[in-house]
């Protein structure tokens, strides 16, 4: 390679790095803006939870970006998984959903996933497994959850799910609460004393997990939850404090592999 070719290649690589850094910045800004949008009021938070209820395999930060770009997404995966494992080709012209990965290692970068709606089947194609609960599954699913979280007192399935979700949150919320207190500065939570901070976090987390579980299981959350029970979301007014709530809410409390039946 000549010196001129080396200089040209180096210029191309530098330009590419700048372009990628700019795209990463734009996606990061999108995540922050979406975090602000979904904590402005209860309706925004519920809209996010509706999407998150279908995306339990993803971390909160990724759920947030999927919601920002494709709120109607039902099953997302990388192109390689669709092509090689599922035998489904991504349709021409489909726009990938950008996710930020590698931040925990100090090397953040963008990776892209595609919703099943952006794919088409080819010979030997597999349908993605979409978690669904029908009425005949209530008893075995509730029994499986109660074996993990303890028996409840409620008889009606939706109320039993509410009770189970509250028990599950009580097991995990303390581990997230300490870190939340460190990051409360600059948010509406900053003015809360320790007791009120804990109450707000626990109650908002409980209602959020209940809403998500009810939605995932085909119930209408408004039949069991009032908007007032989710009103605490407006206190999580910075991305850093929302991050703690979102991570706690997206913990895999209830996933198909934890249950005794497959649908």
Regions found by a protein language model. Give the residues of each.
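N-terminal accessory/interface modules of nucleic-acid-binding and processing proteins
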Residues: 2, 8, 14-263
